[in-house]
Amino acid sequence: MLVFKGKLKEHPRWEVENELYRFRNRVFSDRLGWDVESHRGLEQDSFDTPDTHWVLIEDEEGLCGCIRLLSCAKDYMLPSIFPTALAGEAPPRSNDVWELTRLAIDAERAPRLGNGISELTCIIFREVYAFAKAQGIRELVAVVSLPVERIFRRLGLPIERLGHRQAVDLGAVRGVGIRFHLDERFARAVGQPLQGAYDEARELVTE
């Protein structure tokens, strides 16, 4: 499998952008039934800009995993779309706090860890951790459904709920706003031995 970390315009294949939006549509619209912006089979929103950062995983069949990273110094989903998930807490407004959104995987296309979690989830967060350390990010936030929160805890990611810590209505599901602590516990969780082979995709080089 190939793992890419960066902006879509840096990806070695230009067609990956539409592949990403189709993959997201299959997961969030078709499979989960979320009320997302979908047009002609592509799921895309206002947070998808040329400067948005991504982690993508591909195999011989195409994309099988993704996550979007947004700086909290700019507009991001938690306060704009899901303010109730802040649970009374003030939204972070700093470039050293980033938001994770649009996490999606096709879990059956990779081996599973001993705890049953797909290796794709582990790989995505390994790359997120590397990105955060390289960018001087001290904290990550996200809005997640309750089942996804349980997956994160099973993986061993150090998370805590925001504000009053109670689940809220997110529309199609109930969920919570969470904070990730980028410490040695996070490093241990994403440093587990893996069965699959995951290689770095080469970035596009321009003159």
UniProtKB/Swiss-Prot annotation:
Gene Ontology terms: biological process: quorum sensing; signal transduction
GO molecular function, one term: N-acyl homoserine lactone synthase activity
Keyword Zinc-finger: no
The keyword Metal-binding belongs to this UniProt entry's keyword annotation: no
InterPro entries found in the cross-reference section: Acyl_CoA_acyltransferase (IPR016181), Autoind_synth_CS (IPR018311), Autoind_synthase (IPR001690)
SUPFAM superfamilies attached to this UniProt entry: Acyl-CoA N-acyltransferases (Nat) (SSF55729)
Residue ranges the record marks as coiled coil: none
Reaction catalyzed: a fatty acyl-[ACP] + S-adenosyl-L-methionine = an N-acyl-L-homoserine lactone + S-methyl-5'-thioadenosine + holo-[ACP] + H(+)
Enzyme Commission number(s): 2.3.1.184
UniProt keyword annotations, A-Z: Autoinducer synthesis, Quorum sensing, S-adenosyl-L-methionine, Transferase
Superkingdom assignment: Bacteria
Family from the record: Belongs to the autoinducer synthase family.
Known role: Required for the synthesis of N-butanoyl-L-homoserine lactone (BHL), an autoinducer molecule which binds to AhyR.
Protein name listed in UniProt: Acyl-homoserine-lactone synthase
Organism whose genome encodes this protein: Aeromonas hydrophila
Annotated gene: ahyI
